[in-house]
């Protein structure tokens, strides 16, 4: 399965909204970031480091701090994963040495660039070094951490003096080095082999780009469900806001959450009698997880400060790509479609929405891709065919020949009406494929803000063995029909709209057409279409 996923599966918290100009120097920015690290607010630290690097791109301390925060965040996320805990408890040395070898071989075979075994091993050593200072790792693996602190410090120093960037000539030598590290940690710390080797297995992937990662069984199942457009749970997207609780960014249509009265912009304050106003996103998510048919009781506050509570039963939730379709200007026949993902059934949903609007007199379309993180490559090409008459819509190029593909459309399903595309900084991957095709084919006007800038392809590589594990690897870059790649910069819109007041697009499914029209991005899109229609 080939994916375009804009974000790297970090459930980050809500960072303080600081503009780059808020820092007068890199050391000042570093201090603010390290304060968040000290408070173990890894997600917020990651966001703040990224923002600081926009101003001080070459600062090595900020770059290292970002890597450190990402490693700690990954360690704590793994240890909050039940499937990872199962691996920790029942995996032996030989099994995990084989897993390390399998992961590396898959990386060498599929990844966009060649990665040396020495580099892969070195990043595993760094992950173990960081983990030995992580409170969650220490609490899980050491019953009496205070009594062992001096030994922990000694082992960390040995990792630097003996194993840091240690060159290896092949798999056999690598297994010897890993065995030696296991022996050291068992002798000095009574740390079991699985805790050591799993840091190497998962941490080795830190040598890759930020979109490449080894997925635990639970995360692989979650990803598979997202691709298929289904999940088990309540059907919410949330971010922690310190002191306020879990801010609901989205509530899925037809989900237990929506049916029980939860709405975007509500704040969950209590989960099964646990106050979550100061929990991290990940910690709150652990409390919300459960099997289909199980119940959870929530308390929440709505935007009008009204308090609510209720019991919700977890079940399978279908994730829809098209979350709103409506006519915005019936006189001129201007319709609106909101698309939030590119999944297996997205094209069928889009076709149904288009047929419905066409029955109402559709003459021009506003396609809203704001906040759309992407999805499946084949789906993106099929969506593009609904609007591009013929020719290339996207091409991919990778290290392996099978990653070099050109996606063409024939115009069989093309709609000829004028198009306005709305994008923003969270429109990524597959959304950027559509934007690139619309731009290069001169098919419509693009409105909003620069796109995310993730122009790479990720492939899911299933790992051997009984456990349902997989690698998500960057295997290629993609290019617009005119052979442009906007990685790191994003595609600029034709009509730039300042992002002064962010309108939450998930609200649009319950707003009237007049309320949608009042959104600045939509208003600009309608204006462009009206001008186009008046010329016809």
Predicted feature locations:
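Structured segments of extracytoplasmic/periplasmic soluble domains
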Residues: 51-55, 102, 106-114, 123, ...
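Conserved functional hotspot residues or short segments at active or partner-binding sites
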Residues: 470, 479-536
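PDZ/PDZ-like domain segments forming the peptide/carboxylate-binding groove
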Residues: 89, 93, 109-110, 130, ...
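Cleft-lining beta-strand/loop regions that shape enzyme active-site pockets
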Residues: 34-39, 53, 187-193, 215-218, ...
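Signal peptide processing junction and immediate N-terminal pro/mature segment
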Residues: 9-17
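Terminal targeting/pro-maturation regions of precursor/exported proteins
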Residues: 16-212
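Bacterial N-terminal signal peptides
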Residues: 1-8
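PDZ/PDZ-like peptide-tail recognition elements
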Residues: 123, 194, 199-202, 208-250
């Amino acid at each position: 399965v080939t994916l375009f996923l804009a974000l790297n599966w970090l459930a980050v918290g809500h960072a303080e909204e600081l503009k780059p100009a808020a820092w007068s120097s890199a050391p000042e920015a570093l201090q603010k970031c390290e304060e968040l690290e000290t408070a173990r607010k890894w997600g917020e630290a990651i966001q703040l480091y990224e923002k600081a690097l926009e101003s001080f791109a070459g600062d090595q301390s900020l770059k290292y701090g970002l890597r450190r925060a990402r490693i700690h965040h990954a360690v704590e996320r793994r240890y909050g994963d039940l499937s990872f805990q199962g691996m920790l408890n029942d995996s032996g040395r030989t099994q995990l040495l084989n897993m390390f070898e399998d992961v590396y071989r898959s990386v060498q075979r599929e990844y966009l660039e060649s990665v040396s075994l020495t580099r892969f091993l070195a990043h595993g050593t760094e992950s173990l070094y960081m983990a030995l200072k992580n409170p969650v790792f220490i609490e899980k693996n050491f019953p009496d951490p205070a009594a062992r602190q001096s030994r922990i410090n000694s082992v960390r120093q040995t990792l630097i003096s003996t194993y840091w960037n240690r060159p290896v000539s092949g798999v056999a030598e690598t297994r010897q080095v890993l065995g030696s590290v296991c022996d050291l940690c068992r002798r000095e710390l009574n740390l079991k082999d699985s805790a050591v080797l799993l840091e190497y297995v998962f941490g080795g992937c830190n040598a890759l780009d930020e979109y490449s990662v080894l997925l635990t069984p639970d995360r692989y199942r979650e990803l598979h469900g997202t691709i298929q457009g289904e999940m088990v749970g309540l059907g919410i997207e949330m971010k922690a806001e310190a002191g306020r609780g879990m801010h609901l960014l989205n509530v899925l249509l037809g989900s237990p959450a929506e049916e029980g009265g939860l709405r975007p912009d509500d704040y969950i304050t209590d989960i099964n009698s646990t106050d979550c106003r100061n929990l991290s996103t990940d910690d709150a998510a652990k409390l919300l997880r459960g099997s289909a048919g199980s119940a959870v009781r929530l308390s929440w506050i709505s935007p009008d400060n009204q308090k609510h509570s209720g019991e919700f039963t977890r079940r399978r939730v279908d994730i829809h790509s098209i979350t709103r379709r409506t006519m915005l200007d019936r006189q001129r026949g201007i319709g609106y479609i909101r698309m939030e993902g590119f999944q297996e059934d997205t094209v069928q949903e889009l076709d149904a929405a288009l047929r419905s609007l066409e029955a109402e007199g559709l003459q021009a379309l506003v396609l809203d891709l704001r906040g759309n993180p992407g999805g499946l490559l084949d789906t993106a090409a099929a969506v593009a065919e609904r609007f591009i008459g013929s020719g290339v819509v996207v091409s991919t190029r990778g290290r392996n020949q099978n990653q070099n593909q050109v996606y063409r459309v024939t115009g069989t399903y093309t709609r000829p009406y004028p198009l306005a595309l709305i994008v923003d900084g969270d429109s990524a991957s597959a959304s950027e494929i559509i934007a690139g095709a619309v731009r290069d084919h001169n098919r419509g006007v693009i409105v909003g803000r620069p796109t995310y800038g993730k122009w790479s392809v990720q492939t899911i590589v299933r790992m051997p063995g009984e456990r349902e594990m997989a690698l998500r690897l960057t295997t290629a870059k993609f290019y617009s029909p005119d052979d442009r790649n906007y990685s790191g910069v994003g595609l600029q819109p034709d009509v730039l709209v300042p992002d002064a007041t962010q309108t939450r697009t998930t609200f649009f499914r319950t707003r009237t057409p007049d309320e949608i029209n009042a959104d600045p991005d939509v208003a600009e899109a309608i204006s462009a279409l009206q001008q186009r229609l008046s010329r016809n």
